[in-house]
Amino acid sequence: MSTTLDTRPDETSSRRRWLVLAVMSIGTLIVFIDNTVVNTALPAISIDLGASTSTLQWIVDAYVLVLAGLLLLGGSLGDRFGRKRWMIVGLFVFGAGSVGAALTTTAGGLVGFRGVQGLGAALVLPATLSIITNVFPRGERAKAIGIWTAVGGLGIGLGPVLGGWLVDNIGWSSVFWLHIPILAAALIGMIFVPESRDERDLGLDLPGALLSTTGLIALVYGIIQGPEAGWSSPEILVAFGLAVTLLTGFAVVEARSEAPMLPLRFFRQRDFTGAVLTLGLIIFGMLVTFFFLTQFFQIVQGRSAFEAGLLIIPASVGMILGAPLSGVLVKKIGPRYLVLAMAGAMITGVLLLTGVEIDSSTLSIIIPLGIFGFGAGLGMPALTDTVMAAVPEADAGVGSAVNDVSRELGGALGIATIGSFVSSFYRSNVSDALVGTVPNEVVELVGESVGVATVVAASLPEEVGATVIAAANQAFIDAMNTGFRISAAVLVSAIVIAFTLIPRQMRAEQATEERKVDDPAGAVPEPSAA
């Protein structure tokens, strides 16, 4: 093994391994909470700091942009100079960004500090999974990754709930102060985490780091800004052109490097490539579903941000219930069929949601969400374990970073592309419903979004306003349900990729270690690699 550890996996006590997992889970929780907690604070931030709509978007997107752009670099720094060391640096950077965001008095300052948080997260997130990979022997790794995945799902669900309650009861800055005690707990827990790194003295792949970081930032910028600027606008075409040029240059540099940051040979392995692609598509479908349901709950049904967050929780509960089963089932049926079961459950859940109407009962929504989340919990740990099993432990940080990049790109691309389709469908539907009923300028304003329609309706005579609200709500629901169908189609494509590229059974050495844990004294048959 080409990784040095203060304590190697087979020498680490079982109690200490699970303590390390708890600390890594706290780090993961911080990152995933921050992905969603700010959304509920945006209206209050807009009023207090006078932020425009585009600035509010960048308060959210600055975090995603920096996080996605620097993940590969963050993973590589941990591999080469110490995963524990760079995770601690990341926690401090994230804390500095959180304090700055809580204290800032300008919208521009808040955008900047969100970027600092993204930098910290890019150092923390790949370190958590790579440390787990190096601390846990293969026989326990699937279970540990299942718990790590469940905590990520919990963070996604807790963000809107905690954010809604804090904004309603304390104020928007409290969503950033929330991170400080969690960060303190993680930093104290790092005392128990052994150091690990690639024992080869490779140094930093500076050309690869620069090309990958700038290329990913250009790509994510194009994805984020595409819906607003227009996919064929010069700004977006330049961003995508830069992304293609820089990432192609990155591939060329890595292919020629004696010590590449991201060895391209990983992608020649069908299981690695298949798991990365499938994971991106799964997150694509997942975040789109949450994105539109949150708007439906708050704008169409008139619920508070806190209530909307609570109604998303069943998906997180489903993930928490499904993730621990993943490690058990993957040994019995293999990753391919487990991923197929995951996608099937998620497709079932999202198709059940296509029947949502304005007056749909809470139960008719949370049951499909629970099925959706349970499916995600079943399969996502198996996908992550497949990615990590395909890379040497010395490169665990970069393997973890690729896993995380696929998540971030999948989520950003899903919200941007399906969001564009849904906005277009909404605009067309509401225009057809209102043309000839209200002035054309009102139709134009209402067509911007269902949220704008609510504001416009309040300024109109009561009867006309009610007509506008009814048309806008129905147009949004019809468009949202179309978005759910597109999401289901994307999940079907994940099934095709999984069936084609994901192996029927785990890698031989991985399966052998799993079975040794179940029956240490028993003979271990060699599994099929088909």
Description of each model-found segment:
Residues 82-91, 105-108, 127-128, 136-143, ...:
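C-terminal module of multi-pass small-molecule transporters
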Residues 71-208, 234-237, 317, 359, ...:
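Helix-loop-helix hairpins in multi-pass membrane proteins, especially solute transporters
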Residues 29, 61, 65, 92, ...:
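Transmembrane alpha-helical cores of Major Facilitator Superfamily
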Residues 180-198, 215-224, 243-256, 497-502:
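C-terminal membrane-cytosol helix-exit motif in multi-pass small-molecule transporters
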Residues 2-28, 32, 192, 271, ...:
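Transmembrane-helix exit segments and adjacent C-terminal regions of multi-pass membrane proteins
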